[in-house]
Amino acid sequence: MKHYFLLLLLIGCIASGHAESGWKAHWINTERCQSETNTWLAFRKTVHIDKVPQTLTARIAADSKYWLWINGRLVVFEGGLKRGPSPYDTYYDPVEIAPYLQNGENTIAVLVWHFGKSGFSHVNSGLAALLFEAVAPGVEIVSDKSWQCTVYDAYQDTEAPYPNYRLPESNIRFDARMEMSGWNQPGYTGKMPNAEII
């Protein structure tokens, strides 16, 4: 009887852990991405929504920081946690996005900054990628191969001096000659490859 009780307890724990994952989204990045130090990735997706729900929470995770635009409007400035992944709790941001959506076509754009190194206050996952999920009746926006993604080459490393070794951030140079003007706006016509599921 004691073994039977332990077996039921174990099955319950496994089922509970599986149910908690419940994600329809996938971690995505681009074939060109090597998850190197100071990597910047641009993601975008156009979605059609017949009727915007009253509330829609997006669950967003990235290592390390991200910026979110919806229909050209900045919704999140420097989201994400400066600590990296943890095996003991969640590390995604819940973001209410319904006020930024409209009936019809919507453009979601996310810029991800992957530190690519650990510091005293950050644990590097080793993965430059995005996880995005917003699901409600009649609406499903999930990161998958239908998203577009590219390494944003305008963001570059600099020469020394570098930040203190305790910090995971890097110095940043932005080369405006390589800017992808309007990539985060509706109607962008530039070429971006489809994302890869990792």
Locations of regions flagged by a protein language model:
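Catalytic cores of secreted or luminal carbohydrate-active enzymes
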Residues: 179-198
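Sec-dependent N-terminal signal peptides
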Residues: 4-13
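Short, solvent-exposed loop/edge segments of extracellular or virion-exposed proteins
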Residues: 27-31
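Accessory beta-strand-rich segments of carbohydrate-active enzymes
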Residues: 33-34, 38, 43-179, 192
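Boundary at the C-terminal end of the N-terminal hydrophobic targeting segment
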Residues: 17-21
